[in-house]
Amino acid sequence: MTSCHVAEDPIKKVAIFGGTHGNELTGVFLVKHWLENSTEIQRTGLEVKPFITNPRAVKKCTRYIDCDLNRVFDPENLGKKKSEDLPYEVRRAQEINHLFGPKDSEDSYDIIFDLHNTTSNMGCTLILEDSRNDFLIQMFHYIKTSLAPLPCYVYLIEHPSLKYATTRSIAKYPVGIEVGPQPQGVLRADILDQMRKMIQHALDFIHNFNEGKEFPPCAIEVYKIMRKVDYPRNESGEISAIIHPKLQDQDWKPLHPEDPVFLTLDGKTIPLGGDQTVYPVFVNEAAYYEKKEAFAKTTKLTLNANSIRSSLH
């Protein structure tokens, strides 16, 4: 681990997004609460803006209206000429980019926390998009340490061919927060409490950083996406096997080549196959049936961060 020191600009503008998917209710309810009473998210010298990203989907308690808002923040969609013919979420993405971006510009918000729920048994999860970002690795280390002994996992979605174009990607530092298991359209007090604590610790980290605290070199364990796995299908393209009981709810646990992953209605077990141990995430996620994803394979690795402190101190 290197001990090189990195001076970062202080953080000034932070947004907390809820309702990117309108049926993931923890973020929706927290953001609505903070819009009425923002006391617990305020920190000295920091602008923190709670924001409902997909109000139409929230109103209907559905994931989206026309298309997934969390996949359209790419140059092509953000650059499309404004028109009522555009999908609602593309128009909304352009509005959000105007309010909190523009993406890849000096004017964009410093940090966006995007709050999500999953039906998978993933517990507290932080989603990282850049494995070389000292600031975010330090923040995630702080959150993980603060939450202990409650586990908090880091999912690294850096991949050469899987492009996400997430809602939060317009910020200089995008942070995905994913907490589960929670059914769509349902609120659970334990899940809400965990997400609330993750935001509190994240804001405390930013406050400490802005106040001049130096964070020494650190390392975190992350799970990096390898590939997404579809369900077995018949000639008509319909699902022909379901998640095996021994895989269900086993997110983040080691999965070996001989381990069962699918079960047919005839009772046939289908093993993982391949030649390496992987770590499954988003196992049997309800929202991913339409995306043809039964689970994602990840590999476990360690990321190191240099020490950081604010350039003002």
UniProtKB/Swiss-Prot annotation:
What are the EC numbers? Answer: 3.5.1.15
Name this polypeptide is given: Aspartoacylase
Question: Origin organism of this chain?
Answer: Bos taurus (Bovine)
Binding of N-acetyl-L-aspartate occurs at: 63, 70-71, 164, 168, 288
- Reactions accelerated catalytically: an N-acyl-L-aspartate + H2O = a carboxylate + L-aspartate; N-acetyl-L-aspartate + H2O = L-aspartate + acetate
Gene3D superfamilies, sorted: 2.20.25.160, Zn peptidases
* Annotated catalytic residues: 178 (proton donor/acceptor)
Q: What family name appears in the similarity comment?
A: Belongs to the AspA/AstE family. Aspartoacylase subfamily.
Q: Which domain of life does the UniProt lineage start with?
A: Eukaryota
- Provide the top EC class: hydrolase
